[in-house]
Amino acid sequence: MEKKVIKKKRKKQEKRKKFRKFWKLGIEEFNTQYFSISRDHELVVREGNYQYNIFDLVQKFGSPLEVAFPFIVEKRYLDLVQTFNYHIKDYGYKGRFFYHYPMKVNQNKEVVLPLISEGANLETGSYNELWLVRKLWEQDQFDSRIRVICNGPKTDRYLGLVQELKEKGLSIIPIIEDLNEYEALKKYRGDVGVRVKLDLRVKSRWDKKNDRYGLSADDIYELGRIKNLKLLHYHIGSQTMHKDDIVAAVKKAIGIYIKIKKSNPSLDTLDIGGGLAIPYEKKKHYNPSSVVKSIISVLKKTCDKEGISHPNIICEWGRYMVAPAQITIFKILCEKPIDHGIAKNWYIIDGSFMNDLIDTWAIHQKWHIVPVNNLRNEKLTRVWLAGSSCDSDDRYTAGGSYILLPRLEDLDSSEYQYIALFDSGAYQDSLASHHCLLSSPAKIIAQNGVLTVARRRESPEEVGKMFGW
């Protein structure tokens, strides 16, 4: 009898494992290591010994719903710092590593404060973002050692705030991005950085033939000595798909760095910008540790050969840091047949791709989509998803492929199917809109076993007020 019970238990475990594998859950390489399937066939998220049942959350808070997990951000930050420091020590590299979180990726409090609390530095791209830094600084929410880099067009207000914070004791470095900014910062008494255009084509979401950011290497050489130059910065793109492109950029940048340092001995830091990709589609991808290892190796070998001291390293990998720390939940309202197409039906969701996940429309972003309930249903159907706005572009077709989801005909009459879209923590919140006056999703934060409402569901009156009604 006992053997039968054990055998039955093993069968259940094997079946659960099979479905986890099918939905690509519990896999660190895909950033789904915290996600699993409950005994009731529902999506769960595990934070140590805490567990969040996503189906229960959507029953309690309704849909559409965003669920943010600050603990994932904290863990990713600590892992990245540990990875850099490990390879720095392993190679005998003499420079230090600093992570600067680019606030534009996600300015929400539940993201920024956990990163700061773990020791992350910041990068701002506008006066308003730096104003928020000032507010936190005045509230004594910063360690005095925090460092801030300022990118973006430097308006007079922006530069004035940089000067004010520098005088108050904040370690702050404005980045020169054009010759006008070079002139404007001549009287600035603090450290400065300069952004270089690498003139390097890579496969990424942001690889443009004409780059409007930064100065050419020749322009920087012609400037000669730049007062208090501390940092050389570049940015090759977003979602850089090949490791070799990241390494090629480092090789080119360190060559430029060495030339500039000859006339600027104060230069001691290389900021490699952002661009580290994440596996949105949950396919095999380069390993971040191998990227870091190659970066350290290239910098050390090149500097040792040229007799130059190893520069400190800054990276601004924002999407990599925060995208996996949020999921977006929708309810399937109904289905409609597709007459001609690889998918069989449209599933109509109770939210909007154009409003809530705008990269679906803007850059044809692909998402990993998993059922919230009925995760062990073996009968699945090929579908496309349509948003609730009246716009024909409000849809998701997986790049011309299809999404596999449970069949609605198999549900109980009173049951709804819910779906989770992974990796929605980068850019989507700040770019969101209210097309067709649709309300934004409600948002909750799950941390340390506690649920906090970060944004309650908007009423029609509240949405109308945004448009003057």
What spans do the regions from the language model cover?
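Short glycine/threonine-rich loop-to-helix capping motif typified by GTGT followed
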Residues: 242-248, 279-291, 322-334, 400, ...
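Charged (often Lys/Glu-rich) extended helix/loop segments that serve as interaction or gating elements
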Residues: 304, 308-469
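Active-site-proximal beta-alpha core segment in soluble small-molecule metabolic enzymes
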Residues: 92-269, 276-278, 298
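N-terminal capping/small domains of soluble enzymes
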Residues: 2-156, 400-422, 426-429, 434-436, ...
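Alpha-helix-loop-beta-strand connector modules within alpha/beta enzyme cores
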Residues: 253, 291-303
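Flexible glycine/acidic-rich beta-alpha junction loops that bind and position SAM and/or redox cofactors
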Residues: 202, 268-283, 314-326, 356
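Glycine-rich, proline-tolerant flexible connector loops at the mouths of alpha/beta enzymes
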Residues: 67-70, 237, 241, 280-283
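Short, glycine-/Ser/Thr-/acidic-enriched flexible segments
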Residues: 72, 106, 129, 155, ...
